[in-house]
Amino acid sequence: MAIGDTNITVVGNIVADPELRFTPSGAAVANFRIASTPRSFNRQTNQWEDGEALFLTVNVWRQAAENVAESLSKGMRVIVTGRLKQRSYETREGEKRSVFEVEADEVGPSLTFAKADVQRTPRGGNSGGNYGGGNQGGGLGGNQGNQQGGFSNQNSGGFGGNQGNQQQSNQGGFGGNQNQSQGNNFNQGGFGGGSPQAAPDNDPWNSAPPAGSGGFGGADDEPPF
């Protein structure tokens, strides 16, 4: 907004359906005319009377222009706020004329005698960034990556580590038991190669004299009967 602009707010009815056009650069612009008619109450006749109508052309640019073309139509009562501009032009006959137009900042329906269903349209510059590859999309991808990474590292890794610990501890313990068993076998081997234990009392060889006391070969080969 430049210094010295004449700000204006107009309430009126749309005379004709808005026209949507596009500039060579691709910018959308919508034009429509409104009639703002003052009304006053005549106490003598006890009726409302219409004054002289003010006709103004309204120009709307970019995304708002597309929304206006899709939402508004002839006869609707609207509220327009913007800057009052004077535009001069020359007719085909060479006559110079001037018109007053409103460069609209905001356009909306008047809800005094009507209802409106407002639907928000996604903004082209931010919708792709937010949902496609911007903040929301990137944040969502990052969260999924963290969740998957954390799940893989924590659960899978921890589960594998536990299995590894169980296998090592169990196998190691089992191996230790085997080693202990082998140690017992060694003891048995020692038992086999060590001094003989005492024979039972009912052993027939128990009453034989010790070896080397006499008999054939210096030892008793047969028990006495």
Swiss-Prot record:
It comes from the Bacteria. PROSITE patterns: SSB (PS50935). Residues 3-111 form the SSB domain. Residues 164-188 have a biased composition (Low complexity). GO terms for cellular component: nucleoid. It holds the Pfam family SSB. Keywords: DNA-binding. One of its GO terms (biological process) is DNA replication. SUPFAM superfamilies: Nucleic acid-binding proteins. One of its GO terms (molecular function) is single-stranded DNA binding. Homotetramer. This is Single-stranded DNA-binding protein. It comes from Corynebacterium glutamicum (strain ATCC 13032 / DSM 20300 / JCM 1318 / BCRC 11384 / CCUG 27702 / LMG 3730 / NBRC 12168 / NCIMB 10025 / NRRL B-2784 / 534).
